[in-house]
Design a protein with these regions (language model features):
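Short linear sequence motif anchored by a di-proline
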Residues: 1-174
Length: 174
């Protein structure tokens, strides 16, 4: 499960990394948590990219109430195509979620120990994400979830799940 991450890169680095046409307005943070508005990169019809801020905790479009609904922060890659909460977003509304690292907690004899997982060079990368629009009468909510998968051998001692990471050469395919 991915429940905390960080994005500390500069606006300029994000523009360059994701080949954006406009400057990005966001607050760098070492502790991004569910229910916060987070930076997402979406691809437009002309294959250019732009950033949007979405609430982290996907509310399905068919949900009756945005406040009492489950806010789904993660979607399992193994079931994302079939689950009613995610299947439409998986087909039509994918996004990239910029990050510099994420946190996982491993159980040990003293309770839990936090690990910060990041690239060795500390550079940006992107989580695979889904976004959704929930609408009811005059209220509209845009929200997202991070897709997770089984942990790699390197990650397995810390946690059995990890975010799906998309490499830059696959951004357009995602």
């Amino acid at each position: 499960m991915c429940g905390r991450y960080n994005l500390t890169a500069s606006s300029e680095a994000i523009v360059e990394h994701f080949q954006l046409l406009r400057q990005v307005k966001f607050q760098p943070s070492y502790n991004i948590a569910p229910a916060q508005k987070i930076l997402n990169v979406v691809e437009l019809d002309d294959q250019s990219r732009k950033t949007v801020n979405l609430y982290w905790g996907l509310v399905p479009s068919w949900s009756k109430d945005s406040k009492n609904s489950s806010h789904l922060i993660n979607a399992r890659m193994e079931t994302v195509r079939e689950k009613p909460s995610f299947r439409s977003a998986f087909k039509h509304r994918r996004c990239l979620i910029p990050a510099n690292g994420f946190y996982e907690w491993a159980k040990n004899e003293d309770g839990k120990k936090a690990f910060h997982i990041h690239r060795q060079d500390q550079q940006l990368f992107a989580f695979a994400g889904l976004w959704e629009q929930w609408q009811h009468e005059t209220e509209t909510l845009y929200s997202c979830a991070i897709i997770t998968t089984a942990a790699t051998d390197l990650m397995q001692p810390i946690h059995d799940r990890m975010p799906v990471i998309i490499t830059p050469e696959h951004y357009h395919q995602w």
